[in-house]
Amino acid sequence: MSFYVVVPARYASTRLPGKPLADIAGKTMVERVAQRCQQSDADQIYVATDDRRIADVLGDTVPVVMTREDHPSGTDRLQEVATKLALADDDIIVNVQGDEPLIPPAVINQVAANLAANPDCQMATLCEAIENSDDLFNPNVVKAVFDNRGKALYFSRAPVPWHRDAFADGQQDLSGGQWWRHIGIYAYRVAFLHQYVQWQPATLEKLESLEQLRAMANGVAIHVEPACEVVPGGVDTQTDLERLRAQLGGQ
């Protein structure tokens, strides 16, 4: 199986400006993510950025693709990368978030293999079980709902599916149900990326602020499967960053 990995790395993060260059135990965030990706089976790893400072830090350790600053979503940025690299329509690109320095290489391989094995899907992604009510009712934890064939039915920031009886009268009983946290790693076919950028943002996409809903609104099948390994949460805030620094301080 052949696939590429692209790591989008924007300097102008809303909640944590300069996040890709944040130092984590002697290495920048973007370097740590790229090194994890290099341990996967990908044919090639690229970092996509709109900031020369990020490219300068990476030097010649990872190929860098400079992109425009005005992309409305990460998927749009990936399409520019695919175009600049002249990738074939049936090539597979895995998008690994630039704030996932602990991403297991095995899940990168997994999501690429899942897309390759499901020719009726144009996207593939992963999930993991939600085991506490704090995560289920947290709008920053995106929930995934999928059918018995692994096809996505919906993604939401709301606690879906809603357990009518267990959640009655303000209860938050998670027994007897299954809830899944969406993990923000995607595999795409290049032909789909060229389609995606032609579509206007969908109503549900704008309401939930979830770009995968644009694909679903246009009839695209998305494959979803539980991750083969635990995927630690990404770095969204200064608190997340400090926790990771403490965790990796001796490495």
UniProtKB/Swiss-Prot annotation:
Pathway: Nucleotide-sugar biosynthesis; CMP-3-deoxy-D-manno-octulosonate biosynthesis; CMP-3-deoxy-D-manno-octulosonate from 3-deoxy-D-manno-octulosonate and CTP: step 1/1; Bacterial outer membrane biogenesis; lipopolysaccharide biosynthesis. It comes from the Bacteria. It holds the Pfam family CTP_transf_3. GO terms for molecular function: 3-deoxy-manno-octulosonate cytidylyltransferase activity. InterPro entries: Cytidylyl_trans, KdsB, Nucleotide-diphossugar_trans. GO terms for cellular component: cytosol. The keyword Transcription regulation does not apply. It is an enzyme of class 2 (transferase). SUPFAM superfamilies: Nucleotide-diphospho-sugar transferases. Its EC number is 2.7.7.38. Keywords: Cytoplasm, Lipopolysaccharide biosynthesis, Nucleotidyltransferase, Transferase. It catalyses: 3-deoxy-alpha-D-manno-oct-2-ulosonate + CTP = CMP-3-deoxy-beta-D-manno-octulosonate + diphosphate. Belongs to the KdsB family. This is 3-deoxy-manno-octulosonate cytidylyltransferase. It comes from Alcanivorax borkumensis (strain ATCC 700651 / DSM 11573 / NCIMB 13689 / SK2). The gene is kdsB.
